[in-house]
Amino acid sequence: MANLGYWLLALFVATWTDVGLCKKRPKPGGWNTGGSRYPGQGNPGGNRYPPQGGGTWGQPHGGGWGQPHGGGWGQPHGGGWGQPHGGGWGQGGGTHSQWNKPSKPKTNMKHVAGAAAAGAVVGGLGGYMLGSAMSRPMIHFGNDWEDRYYRENMYRYPNQVYYRPVDQYNNQNNFVHDCVNITIKQHTVTTTTKGENFTETDVKMMERVVEQMCVTQYQKESQAYYDGRRSSAVLFSSPPMILLISFLIFLIVG
């Protein structure tokens, strides 16, 4: 972690030094760079001709009549007629490029809504996330009939749970209670729409199965949450990071 902080400090100092050198470099060119090299030089013989930089009348930078930078008539920077910056008719930038320009296709909101629904199923559940698939636990219900029924029907029960981030709950019980309710509700609704119904025995077994999976999900999310907080605390308390932050404050204040 300390090595990472040193590398960040070195990278920032190198970047800041390069920016400072770029600011000190003189801008290329000088007076009268680009275009005609003799702006005030007219054609011998009076004022019959305007100042020229090469080419015929009306050519500030060469080309045919009306060509500021070369090309055919009406070509500011070369190309065909009506081409501000080259290309075919009606191409390039400027207002002329809008002629005969095809209109942008309108976004089909039905397609957008369908894509959102297909790619973010949990988005409509108010911030719930879908956990990774788990193996359904082997549970004993107290009698042989229920144990056999569970083994024969366990594939019909959820193997993923819905949950919210652990930092939104005060304790594990609240997390598990919410997780069980939303998971069974969503699974029941989804399965019912496919023409399959659950009995009271199914619901009883699902509650036991989902409860164990929600406990496992809570333990996993809690560990990841606290590991992330600890890593952030170690990073920002390391000497290189403190030095980097102090250097940034010095640059801002100075």
From Swiss-Prot:
Principal subcellular localization: membrane
Binding locations of Cu(2+) 1: H61, G62, G63
Annotated residues for binding of Cu(2+) 4: H85, G86, G87
Disulfide-bonded cysteines: C179-C214
A GO cellular component entry from the record: plasma membrane
Region of interest (5 X 8 AA tandem repeats of P-H-G-G-G-W-G-Q), residue spans: 51-91
Protein name in UniProt: Major prion protein
Species annotation: Sigmodon hispidus
Gene: PRNP
